Amino acid sequence: MKALTVLVAEDDLLSRMVLERSVVQWGYHLASAVDGVAARELLETRSIDICIMDWEMPRMSGVEVCKWLRGSNLKNTPYVILVTSKDQPEDIQAGYEAGADDYITKPCDLKYLRRRIATVADKLQRQNACLEHARSQERAEITIAGLSPLDIYLSDLRLMRRKT
């Protein structure tokens, strides 16, 4: 399986560096943004699987990026984890309503974040494997549809002989 790409969107230099280093150590490809506009540009141009995003960033907040993302026509929309110091119930609700998939308050426990990302990565990789299997089945059905009944019968005979 290919390593997933994680976008870290954080304006605070130290926080961003810690998250970037962690993402790379955990075995994921890294994309990085210093503000919401840069995050949006990366989301438009790169295939991002998971996005770890601060709420309060210059030029465009994490919540604004979430709203834009959910309203966009992107082929691939990433799993979004908002990481923020906003810890009031109404903030958490607003984050989810904006389109965040997950919400973690600062200070961020890296062990917890790693577990969340690993869980999401596992789910995404299983979904991708299922999609690939479905595509393979569809290609096989198209191939079979182009065969004559005699070709299908002979193919079935060959398969039965292999099993015995």
Predicted regions, residues:
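Two-component/phosphorelay signaling modules centered on CheY-like receiver
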Residues: 12-31
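Receiver (REC) domain active-site loop signature in two-component systems and cognate sites
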Residues: 57, 69
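The feature encodes the CheY-like receiver
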Residues: 58-59, 88, 107
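C-terminal output helix
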Residues: 108-117
